[in-house]
Structures are given as C-alpha cells and as structure tokens.
Regions:
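Glycoside hydrolase catalytic-domain context in secreted enzymes
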Residues: 1-274
Length: 274
C-alpha cells in the first residue's frame, strides 16, 4: 500500500525530464513520456537519441488515406518503443481555424470527421507497439494566441459537432489510452477543472477508460482538478504536490479515494501496455 508521500511522487513528472520516477520498494517502474504528433521528440536527455522527423500531419490528412495514416503511426509507435518510451503525446486532433495558428502543422484538418478518421488510425498503430497514445489538446484549444487565458464561448451543438467529434472518435473507435487536457477555458472553466469535459462527457458518456494528463503548466489547482477528473500534472508538481494535496485532504475539499482513482487510472494503462 502506498503512503500519501509515495502517492504524491507519482502524481506529477520529474522536473525537467518527461519521466515520472518509480518506487523501487513497491516494484513501480519509471514512467517515460515523449512528444509528439509528427515524430518522437524525446526531450528527456541531452543529447537525445535521434528519431524520424515525419512530414506535417496536415500533409498526411491532405491525402485522405487512412492506410497512410496507419503507416505514419506505425513509424511513431515503433520508434517510441525502440527508444524505451512508454507514452507518445499525440495525435493532436484540434481543428484548423486560422492559417497562422502555431500548431497547425501537428493537427490534421479543419474538418472534424477527417481529423477523427486520421487520428484513430494513427492511434491504433501507435498502441499496436504497446505504447500509450495521448490525444490532445482536449478541448477547443484551436489557437495558440492567449491560450492560457482565453475562454471559448460556444453552444452545445457547435461544441459537439465540430470540436469534440475527433476526440470522441479517438475514444470510441481508437480505444485511446490517454488524453491531454488543454490550457484554455471553455465557457469560463479551465479545461483541467471541467468536470463536464473530463468526467461527464469523456468518461460517463463516451466510456473513456484511460487517464488524463495536463498540458505543461495548464493545471491550476489540486482539489478542483482532481475532482474534475484530471489525473496527472505535467511537467512538475506545482499543484499536485504533497503540501497542496495534504491541505485539500485536511479541509475535505478532496477525498483520498479521488487520489487513489487518479493513480489507478494511469497504472491500469501502464499494465495494459506492459
């Protein structure tokens, strides 16, 4: 059984590197995470081993060829596994909404269905190599400008028909193992604290069985994030640290079962993918 201190060590990654330290005494291994949607970009050592720099996914989607997307994902999954990594932060299935958006190169299309089809094939191919694929950035993170402060205001029809559809396809058709929450707010609530997005829709409605990781420094709270369904903070324990979690447990804004649940979700996927 883990102590509260041991639980806290596993709630966030090791500073600087994309690794979550294991606990040898409990037989829990180090957990290695790498970026990204257009090829393995390890960023967890200097120098990092080389990997293939693949063409932009917008070019991949322009071929309208699911089989090509599967080959694309096969390269990423194979190299991720060969380099000893456990999680690949991708595919990205946000939509193109402006031609100068900073991450258009790693998203597929302005069309949600095409984005979903291509993302599903990439996901299946990555996970065929016993690598956890992580869909991002959930949700409505379709611009980089002011992404830390923007609140996206949209009605339910638009939210579901356009912005959530690719993520829904990743879950239902791709059986994706992890999801990355976004920086922005949706209807005034930060994505990392949105019970509606992370729990009501993602898990209760779509049946997602994996875990949710924050984007780098997108987490803004301990209790609110964990209660909403966010499971893992990146890249360090700014919020999910021993002090904050202990205080939240003491003031009853957080229950220990919620902490347990966050860890179980992640380690269930670790065991699933060996």
């Amino acid at each position: 059984e883990m102590s509260p201190e041991e639980q806290d060590k596993l709630m966030a990654q090791l500073q600087v590197q994309r690794h979550v330290k294991g606990i040898d005494e409990l037989g829990i291994p180090r957990f290695r995470i790498t970026n990204g949607p257009v090829g393995v970009g390890m960023g967890d050592g200097h120098p990092s081993p080389p990997a293939t720099a693949l063409p932009m996914t917008i070019g991949l989607a322009a071929g309208f060829d699911p089989e090509l997307a599967r080959e694309y994902g096969d390269i990423i999954g194979s190299e991720t596994a060969t380099l000893g990594q456990h999680v690949l932060e991708g595919p990205g299935v946000c939509l193109h909404r402006t031609p100068i958006a900073g991450r258009n190169f790693e998203y597929f299309s302005e069309d949600p269905y095409l984005s979903g089809v291509m993302g599903v094939e990439v996901t299946k191919a990555i996970q065929a190599h016993d690598v956890i694929a992580m869909g991002k950035h959930y949700a409505v993170n379709d611009q980089e400008y002011e992404r830390f402060r923007t609140s996206v205001e949209l009605d339910e029809h638009v939210l579901r028909e356009l912005y959530l559809l690719p993520f829904e396809m990743l879950v239902k058709d791709g059986d994706i193992a992890a999801m990355m929450s976004a920086y922005n707010r949706v209807r005034g609530v930060y994505a990392t604290e949105s019970r509606y997005l992370l729990n009501d829709i993602l898990r209760d409605e779509w049946g997602f069985q994996g875990y949710v990781q924050s984007d780098f420094w997108s987490c803004r709270s301990a209790a609110a994030s964990l209660n909403a369904g966010m499971d893992h903070e990146m890249p360090d324990a700014k919020w999910l640290n021993e002090t904050n979690v202990k205080n939240a447990l003491q003031d009853t804004s957080l229950e220990i079962q919620t902490v347990d649940r966050a860890l179980v979700r992640r380690y269930t996927q670790m065991f699933r993918f060996n």
